[in-house]
Amino acid sequence: MRILIAVQACLLILGRGSSVADAMADFDGWENVVVYPGDFPRTYDYEDEAGVVHRLDEPIAGESWYGGPVLLSWPAVEAGYDESGMALVIHEFAHKIDMLDGTVDGIPPLAGAARESFRREV
């Protein structure tokens, strides 16, 4: 279980930094990965066009919390790539790397010209 999650997570940091230690720094400060035996409930509130607030309970396979853990469903981890082509571990850990600079904007922490180049290409 741990190896499968770790290998997929490490795919995200291949080529980052000038050394393995630099690349692994992307994972500094992360404390927990919680693995559930199946999908798990997520409760959230949303407001519709009329201003009415609704509460929904929705089963999900993964979630990343800013300043918190990565939550994963083991069957989804084992599946690796489902019919949608999404690898859950890579998807959730990409969110965590995006959060490293304090801005959750879909862009990983990059310096100067690399950040601008990334913005232009996306």
What are these regions (language model features)?
Residues M1-R42:
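Extended cationic-aromatic binding surfaces that line active-site or macromolecule-binding grooves
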Residues H91-H95, R115-V122:
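Hydrophobic alpha-helical transmembrane segments and adjacent short intramembrane/lumenal linkers
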